[in-house]
Design a protein with these regions (language model features):
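A membrane-periplasm/extracellular boundary helix in multi-pass inner-membrane enzymes
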Residues: 4-6, 26, 182, 242, ...
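N-terminal signal-anchor transmembrane segment
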Residues: 6-94, 121-125
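Membrane helix-loop boundary segments at the extracytoplasmic
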Residues: 59, 64-70, 381-388, 421-461
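Aromatic-anchored transmembrane helix interface
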Residues: 78-83, 107-119, 129-152, 171
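Alpha-helical transmembrane segments of multi-pass inner-membrane proteins
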Residues: 2-22, 37-44, 112-124, 141-146, ...
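Membrane-interface micro-motifs in multi-pass membrane enzymes
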Residues: 28-32, 73-81, 135-138, 199-210, ...
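Membrane-interfacial loop-to-transmembrane alpha-helix junctions, especially the N-terminal start
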Residues: 46-57, 101-113, 160-167, 232-233, ...
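Long extracytoplasmic/lumenal interhelical loops at the membrane interface
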Residues: 187-192, 317-332, 336, 340, ...
């Protein structure tokens, strides 16, 4: 798919990267490890195609390890490879704009570009510009890799399957590693959040990624595929399910329940408009009866940490479940921040460094912090609202909403069985993340970001491949 001349240009970019890495190592010997991914890329390009490098990144992302230098860090080996591919994308976009023209015309791409532009604007006005521009750069290389390169590479639908197999097999390594560590501590629930380190930060992102891969893999088992492909997806599904169960993550368990209910509605041919209307009605009722709902929740004293059923019951316990109380503390602190800067927000990536001053002592818990070292807003929706204002929030809603609408349309009106299979698998997988995003946010971490942006790239490529592309989404 990629011409020899383009590969030669990537060689040049890679060699330049190698020289820059060597210069960095010469000045700062402790950063020697930075040279390794560039070497891997150059050697790989002499043996493989760009498509295979793409799959290597997918495979290595789940078990990549963060290497810190100063106040910054890179996940190795995947992020340096994504940076090189981002540079190549810029070169190709300038030299061969027609290659990406169909992708750039897609509605999902339009919303995504608006989102990136708004992140740039709010980085300029940020309360911590350096933090925000680091956030923007990391977002750019994951979006470029997963979405733009993905949309191009996934034009061959077989590459969707290859990508998910590569990522899933990489995730199996993490699950086996985590399960072995967990076994060593007697499968303790308290230790569950630590056993995947240093491959993943904690059990929340681990469970979110496992849920996404599980939903995709199980869907693939119910469609026609080659025997060995089904065996691979069966093994990946088994590993992912093990990861979800042993993570003791309430959000992950609920996200899988949610997609099961959604699948039933999908089989009943629910329209996208009906779905949006239903969600709108729920939100309105939530506002009208918020006091009654709060009083009901206030009576819940179910504690987490005993078993999965108890964990799920404890989700609405805002009295003595420390995790829930701390989440409310962060959300209320964030809401005070939003009221102060509703339009532009505090800047992308700044919440964890700024929210401490907006906490109230009576709402803080033993796990609260005032040092900006204990995570973010715990919501994929609330975070952008605080950091990029109301416009940033709406753009995230539009991006997620458009992807659901397109996938539902593809599922209801597929050009062939494979389109139906992939659209359903991607839809259910993304929905686990969108639901999980109500309580956590991971798009600033490569483990989830690569998977989410790649799946959105799959959405665009499937939509471009659809023969009846002019068919209106209003039919959904």
């Amino acid at each position: 798919m990629v011409a020899n001349a383009d590969v030669k240009k990537l060689y040049g970019i890679s060699i330049l990267g190698l020289l820059l890495s060597a210069f960095t190592v010469y000045l700062f010997p402790s950063y020697f490890i930075l040279i390794l991914p560039t070497l891997v890329l150059i050697v790989g390009l002499f043996l493989l195609s760009i498509e295979n490098i793409f799959l290597i990144v997918a495979f290595s992302t789940p078990f990549s390890i963060k290497y810190l230098f100063g106040n910054s860090g890179l996940n190795l080996p995947d992020e340096p490879l994504m940076i090189v591919l981002m540079l190549l994308f810029i070169v190709k976009l300038i030299e061969k704009p027609p290659l990406f023209k169909p992708i750039l015309k897609e509605s999902l791409t339009f919303v995504l570009i608006l989102n990136l532009i708004w992140i740039l604007l709010t980085s300029i006005t940020s309360s911590l510009p350096i933090v925000s521009f680091k956030f923007l750069l990391a977002r750019l290389w994951t979006v470029t890799f997963g979405y733009f390169w993905g949309a191009l590479i996934f034009k061959n639908p077989k590459n969707i399957k290859k990508f998910m197999l590569a990522f899933g097999l990489g995730l199996c390594i993490v699950v086996i590693y985590s399960t072995y560590n967990h076994y060593g501590v007697g499968f303790s629930q308290k230790k569950a959040m630590l056993v995947m380190k240093p491959l993943m930060d904690d059990h929340t992102v681990y469970s979110a990624v496992c849920s996404m891969v599980l939903a995709f893999s199980i869907t693939m088992l119910f469609f026609k595929n080659r025997f060995y492909t089904k065996i691979l997806f069966y093994g990946i599904a088994l590993c992912s399910l093990t990861g979800v169960i042993l993570s003791y993550s309430r959000a992950a368990a609920l996200s899988l329940v949610f997609v099961t209910i959604f699948l039933i509605l999908l089989k009943l041919k629910i329209r996208f408009r009906t779905l949006v209307s239903f969600i709108g009605v729920l939100i309105i009722f939530g506002f009208i009866f918020n006091n009654e709902i709060y009083q009901r929740i206030r009576l819940n004293n179910s504690a987490s940490g005993k078993n999965l059923v108890g964990d799920i019951k404890s989700i609405s316990n805002v009295n003595n479940d420390e995790s829930n109380v701390e989440r409310l503390n962060r959300w209320e602190s964030g809401f005070r921040m939003f009221k102060e800067k509703p339009l532009l927000g505090f800047g992308p990536g700044t919440y964890q460094f700024q929210y401490s001053g907006y906490q109230k002592s009576q709402q803080m818990t033993s796990i609260s912090t005032t040092h900006g070292d204990m995570g973010n807003a715990h919501s994929e929706y609330f975070g952008p609202l605080i950091e990029s204002g109301i416009v940033g929030f709406l753009l995230v809603i539009l991006l997620f909403g458009f992807s659901i609408a397109i996938l539902m349309n593809l599922y209801y009106h597929p050009k062939d069985e494979k389109t139906k299979m992939y659209s359903l698998a991607i839809l259910l997988s993304l929905l686990t993340y969108y639901f999980h995003g109500l309580m956590n946010d991971f798009l600033d971490q490569d483990k989830a970001a690569v998977l989410v942006w790649a799946m959105l790239g799959m959405v665009t490529s499937l939509n471009l491949n659809q023969s009846n592309i002019s068919e209106s989404l209003e039919k959904v």
